[in-house]
Structure formats: structure tokens, C-alpha cells
Amino acid sequence: MDMGIPCSQLARRLLGKMLCRRIEGRTTKGMIVETEAYLGKEDKACHSYGGRRTERNSAMYMKAGTCYVYRIYGRYECFNISSVEAGAGVLVRALEPLCGVSEMRERRGGRVKDRDIANGPSKLCIAMGITRREIDKEWIAGSEKIWLEEGREVADPEIVAGRRIGIRNCGEWEEKKLRFYIRDNEFVSCIRRRELGNRKHGSVQQLP
């Protein structure tokens, strides 16, 4: 997959791709069903806003396709892939588990429904065994630990665009439609009715 495309395009293009993770010879895979684009120094919701560059976010300034893993709330981790612009990247928000599902469920604590295994950015990190120590700064196009495979093509009419989740105090950037997900996919983390017009869907916010 060509990573050398603008961040918002990459966020859409990643939908339908298979995220694969190998640990001690065992591989788990999930189809990416939800993403968010963070556009770099101009984006007030982005870790690199204003050109901010630290050891924590340095992966966002590396070549397109570099994995960026960070922690929230001191315990949960989130997985991102850098895009071609300096400081920009795509947050992978949700997966549809497809291979090694029982192992993914076990990592999530055992008795978890399939749709709840990886329907959130930190849930998917737990399910896939993605940690900052192991995966941050890995290049996804050349890693034996984590990589992408072709899944299925997601046509434009299948893609819903909406506001990113949990963005506060960022002015106009709170309203930017930079979150993308596959329409009617039950593994998406959160669906807002207004993003789907008159269609009857719930609006449920899940664990990060």
C-alpha cells in the first residue's frame, strides 16, 4: 500500500485493510473499520500542533508508514500510522477481528463479544498486543512484528465521515470531518445518528 498520500486520504484508504501482528510466532489479524486523521502542525487536536516535536511524538515526523504508539490516562495505548506530511498521522480506532480471534479475546479478558474485542483504539491495542515499547517507530511496510495486508476494497459510498471522538477546546477543529468508518459495520466504536441522516442507529460511546 502506498503510504505517500495526504493524511485524510490515507485515513480513508486504510479502511478495509488488514492490520496484522505477530507475537512469538502467532499472528492475529483484524480489518480496519474506523480511522481518524490528524493533520499535523495546523491541527489543534494533533500532538504535533504548532510544530511541537518531542521524544514522545517523534514517530510522527518519521517516514510515512511509521507506527506511533502513545499512552492515554496513564494506562491505555493508542496506535497510529504516520502519513507523508511532517507531524501528521492516522489513528486506527477500530478493527473487525478476523484471524486469531480467540487469542485476541483472551487478551481482552476472556468473556468478550466479538464486536467488543477491538471496537476502540485502546481495545484494539490490547487485543493485538500493540505496545509503545514493542511497536512505536516500527515501519509498517518493513516490519516482521506488524504489517498491513490487502483486505477488501471499500467504496466511497460505504465510507461515513464525521467529527473525531473526544476532541475538546480545539475551536473549529472540533467540527472537522476527519473521522472515517465503514457504514453499517457493527465493529465501529461509536455511531452518531446525525452522521447517517435519518437512518436508525444508536449513539454509544465505548471505552477508548
Curated annotation (Swiss-Prot):
Gene Ontology MF terms: alkylbase DNA N-glycosylase activity; DNA binding
One GO term (biological process): base-excision repair
EC number(s) on file: 3.2.2.21
InterPro entries: Formyl_transferase-like_C_sf, MPG, MPG_sf
GO cellular component: nucleus
CDD domains (UniProt xref): AAG
Catalytic activity, reaction form: Hydrolysis of alkylated DNA, releasing 3-methyladenine, 3-methylguanine, 7-methylguanine and 7-methyladenine
Pfam families assigned: Pur_DNA_glyco (PF02245)
Keywords of the record: DNA damage, DNA repair, Hydrolase, Nucleus
Keyword DNA damage annotated: yes
Major location category of this protein: nucleus
Family named by the database record: Belongs to the DNA glycosylase MPG family.
The name this protein goes by in its record: Probable DNA-3-methyladenine glycosylase
